[in-house]
From Swiss-Prot:
GO CC field: extracellular region
Record's function text: PLA2 catalyzes the calcium-dependent hydrolysis of the 2-acyl groups in 3-sn-phosphoglycerides.
EC number of the protein: 3.1.1.4
Binding-site residues, Ca(2+): 27, 29, 31, 48
Protein name according to UniProt: Acidic phospholipase A2
Organism name: Gloydius blomhoffii (Mamushi)
Keyword Signal: no
Family that this chain belongs to: Belongs to the phospholipase A2 family. Group II subfamily. D49 sub-subfamily.
Gene Ontology terms for molecular function: calcium ion binding; calcium-dependent phospholipase A2 activity; phospholipid binding
InterPro entries tied to this protein: PLipase_A2, PLipase_A2_Asp_AS, PLipase_A2_dom, PLipase_A2_dom_sf, PLipase_A2_His_AS
Catalysed reactions, semicolon-separated: a 1,2-diacyl-sn-glycero-3-phosphocholine + H2O = a 1-acyl-sn-glycero-3-phosphocholine + a fatty acid + H(+)
PANTHER family, per the entry: PHOSPHOLIPASE A2 FAMILY MEMBER (PTHR11716), PHOSPHOLIPASE A2, MEMBRANE ASSOCIATED (PTHR11716:SF9)
Additional notes on this entry: Is not neurotoxic.
């Protein structure tokens, strides 16, 4: 679920996903189009693509299970669809963490009119 995604971003990247990525670049937040503006925005693009491959459950609403083992998030549970959502969220949170140094405030609340370039395929 999106609330779990927020929790994973806090645990892994150490910052609020809603605050920092809720409306960032061309892909972070609702929707997405155009060309990712930087590495952090690309994390959101890849996350959107990952959610797009999920079938049989709702990535934004369905709750998944995970554990923390030696500081790492381990996705679990018996439902392969929900496990896939967890992996999408975990990978995005790791991507945010690994690209924190590229985060640029100029892409915060970036106008959609600046995201008109042709989108690349997933």
């Amino acid at each position: 679920s999106l609330m779990q995604f927020e929790t994973l971003i806090m645990k892994i990247a150490g910052r609020s996903g809603i605050w920092y990525y809720g409306s960032y670049g061309c892909y972070c937040g609702a929707g997405g189009q155009g060309r990712p503006q930087d590495a952090s925005d690309r994390c959101c693009f890849v996350h959107d693509c990952c959610y797009g491959k999920v079938t049989g459950c709702d990535p934004k609403l369905d709750v998944y299970t995970y554990t923390e083992e030696n500081g790492a998030i381990v996705c679990g549970g018996d439902d392969p669809c929900k496990k896939q959502i967890c992996e999408c969220d975990k990978d995005a949170a790791i991507c945010f963490r690994d690209n924190i140094d590229t985060y640029d405030n100029k892409y915060w609340f970036f106008p959609a009119k600046n995201c008109q370039e042709e989108s690349e395929p997933c």
